[in-house]
A protein has these predicted regions:
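Bacterial N-terminal signal peptides that target proteins for export
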Residues: 2-17
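N-terminal signal peptide c-region/cleavage motif recognized by signal peptidases
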Residues: 27-28
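N-terminal edge beta-strand
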Residues: 32-51
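Extended, polar beta-sheet/loop recognition surfaces of beta-rich domains
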Residues: 50, 54-61, 119-134
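Short, surface-exposed alpha-helix to beta-strand junction/turn motifs within ectodomains of secreted
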Residues: 55-56, 61-83
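Surface-exposed, short loops/turns at beta-strand junctions within beta-sandwich domains
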Residues: 100-105
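A short tyrosine-centered beta-strand micro-motif
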Residues: 107-109
Length: 134
């Protein structure tokens, strides 16, 4: 009789443990997926012959436009942009920032965005503009 109760108790523990693990996996899955930059124009480390008119960044998740920041910096780390980026109307995973006229040199794009799940990502990357003759 005692042996049957022990087996029953072990099966109940196993079922409880499996349910707890499944519950944790089910609820933690959205937390593991955060926004990430998947593409940019200009591209990372690109060398361009003509300056871009705008910066566009694409992410793997929708972006909260009110919390997006994209800044263009010159080689002295001075900001060249004063306006905020806008989420592209027909592509909520993308933001665009108009760029003033710039010349040759090394530039840095700094960005900070919040995805719709509330996760904030920030990073930066460089690109260069060279004369066609260089």
């Amino acid at each position: 009789m005692r042996n049957i109760q022990l087996k029953s108790f072990s099966v109940n523990q196993l079922i409880f443990l499996l349910m707890a693990i499944l519950s944790l996996l089910w609820h933690s899955n959205p937390v593991m997926a955060h926004a990430a930059l998947v593409k940019s124009d200009p591209p990372r480390r690109a060398t361009l012959s003509t300056p871009p008119k705008q910066i566009q960044l694409w992410f793997n998740e929708k972006i909260e436009g009110a919390y997006a920041s994209v800044v263009l910096l010159d080689s002295n780390k001075k900001s060249l942009t004063e306006n905020n980026p806008e989420v592209v109307a027909d592509d909520p995973k993308s933001v665009v920032l108009n760029v003033p006229e710039i010349g040759t040199g090394k530039y840095t794009i700094q960005y900070r965005v919040m995805s719709v799940d509330g996760h904030v990502i920030e990073s930066s990357f460089d690109f260069n503009i060279k004369n066609k003759m260089q």
